[in-house]
Amino acid sequence: MDSINKDETSKTADKVGAKFQLTDAEVATAYSVVNGSYAWYVSSYTEQLFGTGNNQLLKIEQRVVSEVAGATTFNNEWNATYSNLMNLTQMIEKCSAGGIDEGKNDLLGMAQLLAAINWGVLTDLHGDIPFSECFIVGNSAPKIDSQESIYTAILKLIDDGISNLSNGGSNAGEQDIIYGGDTQKWLALGHALKARYLLHTYGRNKSVISQVESEAQAAIAGGFAGFYLDIFNGVTADNAWSAYQWSRYYIGSSKTVDDLMLERNDPREPYYNFNALGGNVIGIPGDTELASLTETVNEPIWLENGAANLAIMSESELYFILAEAQAIQGKDAKASFEAAVSSNVAEYFEICGDEISSDDVNAYLSDIEPLFEANPLKEIRIQKYLAQTRGEMIETYNDMRRIMYTDGNYPVTMQNPNNNGGTGNRWPYRLPYGDSDVVSNPNVAAAFGSGNEAGMFIFTENVWWAGGSR
């Protein structure tokens, strides 16, 4: 009788082909993991955007400890990312030896690269996390692994992904809604990701910088033009940023960014600081009055384009990585720097519903040339900061912590006065763990702390690649 209502024609999860899980993995990575609340909140910490609307982001601007360090703040994103990783782990198992899709190396490589991105987001933001014992049946309390060991695994996932994709294949088909199953594009992505994650570890191992350069060059040679989810129409399907803004109007433009743009006569400035709501006022980081306003503060106009793509890794990020690696080694980085800026400016205008001529782009490059010539590394990093104001704040947050560790300071000074409260630093060096594991997993609960110390480690302890021990 136990099986009387069982549908014998319905396949269980372990019998579903891996390719049918790919689309969901791509959408979740772009929409929930990279461009969801993680990025929305972090954009206040990096001051690339301003939190307004008299609600959660008001508290973030004020650096209210219960919001910044609370376990409930990122619980949805924590759970969504682990859920996506469970899906990707199933794909990898199905495409590995003994799996139902054994030999489908293209699918295996795609899943491995996506898994590297998702694990990267989790450990970059949270530090030491449950990893090696996750998704094991019967283990409801996986141990916490060190970020150093997780990075070893991430880089292996990328290497394995590149190896598998090198064998070609056409098993993904239309289920791959980003690259259409093109393994050459996935291969280029693999090298781009290798450059990104190696650069994160530069503070721990200076010798990786030449490999960062070579991997970036390999990605460019492979034709890398960005990794974007471009499936939205702005009517029945909106990207994550526009959907969030239209439902709440919690995001505004930041004076920290606008001042840098004005200093450089940046053609993106009118689109970044756009008077969309009639208030014609720009957000000043930490200003409680402005953060308390509703539907008043200026916003980047791209937020009003619901059809805009979502970047998982942009073309400009890769060129900025290459330029930084070259500059660190004392090499000529001008061509890479100009390619990075040109790529982003053109993309920014397109997303904002406009276009810019090559002459105007070249004029801007001429305007900022003296800044580059005076200090190439500084201007590379500032321009990357400006370029990543459209949805790439997680990587900026990573850059800030990495560079503060290697260089002692970041070239863009944060202006929010609430970063330094009367009781010490209130700019988080990482994000708190998700509440579901703080409550149910004793290992995470112990790491999170209890009582007055619960979550407070985020203000004092860096992640491993930024010089910390957890």
Regions found by a protein language model. Name each.
Residues 1-51, 216-219, 301, 404-470:
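Membrane-proximal, proline-rich intrinsically disordered regions
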Residues 15-19, 53-352, 371-377, 383, ...:
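Structured, solvent-exposed acidic/aromatic patches
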Residues 29, 33, 92-95, 388:
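Short amphipathic alpha-helical segments enriched in hydrophobics
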Residues 36, 43-44, 134, 172, ...:
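Residue-level signal for alpha-helical context at structural boundaries
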Residues 46-49, 173-188, 235-241, 361-369, ...:
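Amphipathic alpha-helical surface "interface" segments used
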Residues 332, 336, 394-402:
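Composition- and surface-driven signal marking solvent-exposed, interaction-prone regions
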Residues 344, 348-399, 410-451:
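Conserved SxxK-family serine transpeptidase/carboxypeptidase catalytic domain
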